[in-house]
Amino acid sequence: MAKHRYLPMTEQDEKEMLDVIGVKSIDDLFQDIPEKIRFKRDYDLKPAKSEPALLRELSKLASKNANTTEYASFLGAGVYSHYIPTVVDHVISRSEFYTAYTPYQPEISQGELQAIFEFQTMIAELTGMDLANSSMYDGGTALAEAAMLASGHTKRKKILISGAVHPESSNVLKTYATGQHIEVEVIPELDGKTDIEALKKALSDDIAGFVVQYPNFYGQVEPLAELEKLVHENNSLLLVSSNPLSLGLLTPPGEFGADIVVGDSQVFGIPESFGGPHCGFFAVTNKLMRKVPGRLVGETVDENGKRGYVLTLQAREQHIRRDKATSNICSNQALNALASSVAMATLGKTGLVEMAKQNLDKSHYAKQKFREKGFEVLFSDGFFNEFVVKLSKPIKEVNESLLDEGIIGGYDLGFYEEKYKHHMLVAVTEMRTKEEIDAFVASLEGAK
């Protein structure tokens, strides 16, 4: 019987464990480490704080961050400030969801399975595709997995990706491709969109697929109909990375004939959280159903004829046959997928369209204000909620100045492209007011 039942790692615990493994002391466990490199001094740690004192100190540190509750944010580039209905946190905090893991036992996991099924259904409907999986880690890894699928399906070892795809997603793809010995070629961007002529020249018999973003990194809406025709005439797959909120207004990629549609559902119910964790989605046509990575939940009936939900087509997955799995993704983002599901269900179809329309209207209002003030605004008016403004000063310097005025500025495009030095990618969501937009434009007057 343990002497100290509720106190872990007592001397008694240590002795019992050492006895079991036949070692006399803890030092004996580390005998392989040379004496001269062992740390033998006392740890120079400050005295422990009480809980109230610790909370005060952590709150003080946290207050140094510029958060989107107190600051007007015009920063996007893949992570956006959107309204999150209060019901989202209430639902995902329920213990049945919050502590749930992969629902391998359907007879005791119907609630979780149905929640995942609803997420799949809504994503499939938004993207115009036949089916969607239960989630991926984020938009970038979903894009990379899509390229791996395309290569495996076509038995080709080269992927083309538009230069107007988010650079970070492009880098994730290149990382994945290295291990699979897949070549990645970037098709240059021209005037904020994919260079069509360059794509025509690059298409060949060894191309597995072409990756395009819709709307793209610069906010522009790519001509999917034209791209689809070129790609499919080459017997390659069309892979589209999309902002799901924009699909409340834009024609879904599936209606243009996309083979795979991926993206990140952060725009629905998931906070920015310094860049993650978020929630990727992955939608395909029926012909690719058995090659989809990750979990798939299907609807069925039990022996009594009652509707039920189960994990289906599991032979694709690594927990069944690791060496033959379509992907080695295991745990997914089910909790964040639930958050997105609750947010979408709360909005409803009408609310989602209204939210998308507010993004469109407010961003176009902001662009017009910049033009009225004499700023150079790049590219066409065919954008959703992001556009590019050219300034006369370094964006880093401008953004530091904006912070002093309670504004989080846009993304510094010069970080990735030298030709876009002093160019700011501005995102305007439904959260921004007319007064905030006007103040933002006025604050940039000195950098015109």
From Swiss-Prot:
CDD domains, per the entry: GDC-P
Protein name: Probable glycine dehydrogenase (decarboxylating) subunit 1
Superkingdom of the organism of origin: Bacteria
Enzyme Commission number(s) from the entry: 1.4.4.2
Reactions it catalyzes: N(6)-[(R)-lipoyl]-L-lysyl-[glycine-cleavage complex H protein] + glycine + H(+) = N(6)-[(R)-S(8)-aminomethyldihydrolipoyl]-L-lysyl-[glycine-cleavage complex H protein] + CO2
Pfam family, one: GDC-P
Protein family (similarity comment): Belongs to the GcvP family. N-terminal subunit subfamily.
HAMAP family: GcvPA
Single Gene Ontology BP annotation: nucleoside metabolic process
Organism this protein belongs to: Listeria monocytogenes serotype 4a (strain HCC23)
Keywords from the UniProt entry: Oxidoreductase
Enzyme kind, highest EC tier: oxidoreductase
Assembly, per entry: The glycine cleavage system is composed of four proteins: P, T, L and H. In this organism, the P 'protein' is a heterodimer of two subunits.
